[in-house]
Regions:
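Short glycine/proline-enriched turns and hinge-like loops at secondary-structure junctions
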Residues: 67-70
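Beta1/beta-strand and adjacent pyrophosphate-binding region of the FAD-binding site
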Residues: 72-79
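Hydrophobic/small residue at the entry helix of a nucleotide-binding pocket
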Residues: 81-85, 233
Length: 264
C-alpha cells in the first residue's frame, strides 16, 4: 500500500512441513528457470516471468484489534516469521499517511520497527501469476527476503517530513553484521531485545538534545503497540505494557496493545 507502483500480493511461508517444503521446492525450481533464461536471453527491465497457478484464499479471519492511525507513536515488535504481520502493519500505516495523505485523520508521527531474528541467511523468491509473489524461508532468521520491502518503505517515509521511522534489527547468533543490507535509518544489534527498554524508549523524552533513533514528538499523543512472534516474545511485551503505571500511561496519552502469536 505504501508503494503506489506495486499491485501484487506477497505471501510468506516458512518451509517446515510437507506442503510448505513442496512450495519451497517449487519456488527454487522457478528461480532456477529464471536464472537459466537470463543466461540465454537478458530480460527487459519491465519483463516478469509468470506461472499460472490456481489459488484459493480463505478468510478473512479478522485483523489488528487497534488502529495505529489513532496514535502519534507506534511500536512494532516481531520475532522470526512474526515479521510478516508487522511488515503488513507497517506498510498499511505508511501508505495511509504518505500515499493517502492522512485521509482518515491518521495521527501517526513516528514508528519504531523492531525485529528479532536468529541469523541473516538467504531466501528463495518465485512468482505465481501477475499479482502474487512467494517468499519462502528455508530456515530461521533470513533478513534478505524482508530487506527489500523495508528499504522501499523507508525510502517512501524519507520523503515525508511529518513521519519518522526507525528500524532496529536484533540478531541472536554470531553473524557478520556487514552481511545486513543497507536499510535507511536502521541499526543492527547482536543481542536479544528488551521489551521493557523498547517500550521505555518510546515514552521517555531524550536527555538534552540527544536523539538516538526516533525524534521526540512530545507526550499525550498515545502509543500503539503491536507484538508478533513466539509466545514468549508477545507475553513479554504484554507484561511490559501491563507494568506501566497508570500515571505513565495517562501522560503518554494511552497505550493500545495487540499481539499475534506465531508458532511452528
Amino acid at each position: 500500500m505504501s508503494n503506489v507502483s506495486s499491485r501484487t500480493l506477497t505471501l510468506g511461508s516458512r518451509a517446515v512441513g510437507d506442503w510448505s517444503k513442496a512450495l519451497h521446492a517449487y519456488a527454487q525450481r522457478e528461480k532456477d528457470l529464471i536464472l537459466s533464461s537470463v543466461e540465454t536471453e537478458k530480460p527487459r527491465d519491465d519483463q516478469s516471468i509468470g506461472v499460472p497457478v490456481q489459488v484459493m484464499i480463505d478468510g478473512p479471519y479478522g485483523g489488528c484489534s487497534i488502529d495505529l492511525g489513532e496514535y502519534e507513536s507506534a511500536l512494532l515488535l516481531s520475532g522470526g516469521s512474526g515479521v510478516t504481520f508487522a511488515l503488513g502493519m507497517l506498510d498499511d500505516i505508511v501508505g495511509r499517511v504518505v500515499r493517502l495523505g492522512r485521509r482518515g485523520g491518521e495521527r501517526t508521527k513516528r514508528i519504531e520497527f523492531a525485529w528479532c531474528i536468529r541469523s541473516f541467511g538467504g531466501y528463495h523468491q518465485g512468482r505465481v501469476g501477475p499479482r502474487f509473489h512467494l517468499l519462502i524461508k528455508a530456515a530461521a532468521g533470513h533478513i534478505h527476503w524482508v530487506a527489500p520491502m523495508l528499504m522501499d518503505i523507508a525510502s517512501v517515509v524519507a520523503g515525508c517530513p511529518s513521519l519518522d521511522i526507525h528500524i532496529s534489527i536484533f540478531v541472536t547468533c554470531l553473524c557478520d553484521p556487514e552481511a545486513v543490507p543497507q536499510i535507511p535509518n536502521s541499526v543492527v544489534t547482536m543481542e536479544r531485545p528488551s521489551t521493557h527498554q523498547l517500550l521505555n524508549d518510546m515514552i521517555t523524552p531524550p536527555v538534552g538534545d540527544a536523539v538516538d533513533g526516533l525524534r521526540w514528538v512530545g507526550s499525550g499523543g498515545g502509543l500503539g503497540v503491536c507484538a508478533s512472534g513466539p509466545s514468549e516474545l508477545t507475553r513479554e511485551m504484554a507484561n511490559a505494557v501491563a507494568k506501566l503505571s497508570l500515571t505513565s500511561a495517562e501522560e503518554v496519552g494511552g497505550v493500545g496493545l495487540h499481539t499475534e502469536t506465531f508458532v511452528l
